Amino acid sequence: MDRDQTNSSLFNDDPVLHATWLYYQEGKSQTEVAAIMGVSRVTVVKYLQTARENGLVHINLDVNVFGSIDAALQIRDKFNLQRVIIVPDGEHAGKRDDTKLMRTRLSRAGGMYLNQVIENGDVLGVAWGRTIHQMSKTMTPKSCKNVTVIQMLGSMPSQPDLTIIESSSQIAYKLSGRVASLHVPAVVSSARLAMELQAEPIIRSNFDVLTRCTKAFFVVGNALDENPLIRVGVLNKKEMQTYRDLGAVGVICGRFYDKEGMPVVADVDQRILGISLAQLRQIERKIFLAGGERGYDATLGALLGGYVTDLIVDEGTAEFLLACELPH
């Protein structure tokens, strides 16, 4: 039996497995793999992409490398964080204001990092938004035991680029876990209705899950009219202006805070169904993604408020955090 026949037998005639082994295990170049298999280099690229998408290959950020660069260490020590990951501009230098590109890069880094830090038995609270929705679709599957994923804010009607319940469900699926949904809107018409809904046993039980979160995963949210909370109907522009007038610079799961991280409370707070900032602060590991100049103040406020333990940022945000002066 010749070498080609042996390889075909070893990999059960699966060209994806064969290409993956040659490229990642034997260290062959894509051109060499193509020659060995008798296919084009483009075909090899497609095989390797299929392997990543199907979970045959796990590409992880080495947190010891990315977290040990001088800037990351300085930010970690300055804000008393557990871990800081800076996503380098690389070939995207000069494109920091491209929000779509930023979202793609942060979602990939966030998915890789979450994959590394998630542990068996974790209860993971996730916010919803476009970055997390994108991450849920692209993160690599990981086999975990007894992981529960719960959204930290009630739901709203789905948008073309954002399906709220699907995001938490997909993350749970990728982590071999189960999803716990709040089964309530993010905002209701009155404070009384909000209290009555939370008193319902089935809803109460899921809110209780929030108090048992061991990790939380969320993205920077500013207090500008571009915030998705307005687009999906949680707030209107007048209500957002009220928060700004009260000093709000950022928002996490519908809860606003000022430049020093102190909660900013308005009438609508009593109608929002989700985790509170006080509850969020109690979670052991709080993983925060931030990128883009319009999120600088919100990122700083979140750090000062104690809502973050693990920070993943772009280079621009890292430069801002290194240069900013802390309040005395």
UniProtKB/Swiss-Prot annotation:
The gene is yjhU. SUPFAM superfamilies: NagB/RpiA/CoA transferase-like, Sigma3 and sigma4 domains of RNA polymerase sigma factors. InterPro entries: NagB/RpiA_transferase-like, RNA_pol_sigma_r3/r4-like, SorC_transcr_regulators, Sugar-bd_dom_put, WH-like_DNA-bd_sf. GO terms for biological process: regulation of DNA-templated transcription initiation. It comes from the Bacteria. One of its GO terms (molecular function) is DNA binding. Keywords: DNA-binding, Transcription, Transcription regulation. Disulfide bonds: none annotated. Pfam families: Sugar-bind. Belongs to the SorC transcriptional regulatory family. GO terms for cellular component: cytosol. Signal peptide: none annotated. This is Uncharacterized transcriptional regulator YjhU. Residues 72-91 bind DNA.
